[in-house]
Amino acid sequence: MEQGIITPEANTIAWDGAAYPFESWNRDQTLRSAMQASVNWYLNALDQSAGSAQTEDFFSKIGYGDCNFGNDSDGFWNGSGVKISALEQVELLVKLYRNDFGFRDESIAAVRDAILLDEDGLYGKTGTGRLNDTNIAGWFIGFVETHQGTYFVAVYLHSQNGSDGALAYETASNILKDMNIIE
């Protein structure tokens, strides 16, 4: 959004007609639908429109992990060497929440809208790591605003027997419920 590739009002990217591994990916996508379903082709299209140098500069600017993007033409989130810890993700999310990066307010509002997950006011993003067509890792990073303050959470799960972003989200929700932060 900061580069004008999409805007808060105009962020639909047309589906290219390719058969993707998840039915929810096989349609036109908005920022919200792409974030909700982790639609890699949408995010890759944004990266390609920006160009690899600009994308890498952006992630370096915000300090996204070790910024080891490799040469993956399918997008750095599809198996590159980028490494970021749960703590680093929370620190990055806090900076984004406070808008320490100086992004336009409407860009921040559009991203917040795209990652709103439930009626408890929990915002976040899930991710699933796959190896040989098996889900082996799940993560969730998010925040919730309450009368007592804003709480940030990150959960990373790894299991050869199966783990995914939905399980990490459920785990994070249960932690927040156990701490009486959400109902």
Feature map (PLM): residue ranges:
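Structural recognition of the beta-strand scaffold that forms the well-ordered cores
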Residues: S33-M35, Y42-A45, D66-N68, G142, ...
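Active-site SXXK
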Residues: M1-I13, A34, V153
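Surface-exposed patches in mature extracellular/periplasmic domains of secreted proteins
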Residues: P8-A14, L46-D47, C67-S73, D100-I108
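Envelope-exposed proteins and targeting segments
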Residues: A10, S85-E88, A137-W139, G149
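Acidic helix-start/capping segments at beta-turn-to-alpha-helix junctions
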Residues: N11-S24, S33
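Mid-domain, small-residue-enriched loop/turn segments at the edges of structured enzyme/sensor domains
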Residues: E23-R27, L31, L43-V94
